[in-house]
Amino acid sequence: MNPTEIFNLLVTFKGHKTSSAGEELLGIEEIELTLQDEKNIFDIKETEFQNVVLIESGSDPLVVAKELADASTTVISKIVPIELVIRTRPDLIAEKVITISKDKIKSGETFVVRGDIRGREYIKSKEKFLSSISQEITEKLGVEMEKNSPDWVIQIEVVGENTGLSVLKPENIIKKF
């Protein structure tokens, strides 16, 4: 994967992270079948991480995520629309999260920071990292963190040297089981 890969959706599949069973191939096929109509121009990119693919879509990622959520699929597990892709550097991630959060999260609203770290050479401790981002947002934007029912979810998806960032309403991060 190249630094600063272009993508606006991250999709994970059910299955073991170390398994090379057919979940990833089946998942890619499910995405292709769901998005095959002429209005969707997209590119599915495999990653070095098992059961994780990136999608670059010419359509609104929120709309594409909903299409995938509504489709009858068997292995798609999580669908995350991505607003911004940057290189994986903790200081840059914090800076960009603040930038995109301040335009969305208003005074009196709440947030939670969630994410997955794939590739530990960039960020050693997921818990420490997400906690430090939460603290920085609270201090710089003057908004409260709420884990259980936040108004906004700040989603940080580290995929090796690339990180996808989003500030989304909770219902826009789709988990299928």
Predicted stretch roles:
Residues 1-177:
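SAM-dependent transferase fold signal centered on methyltransferase-like domains
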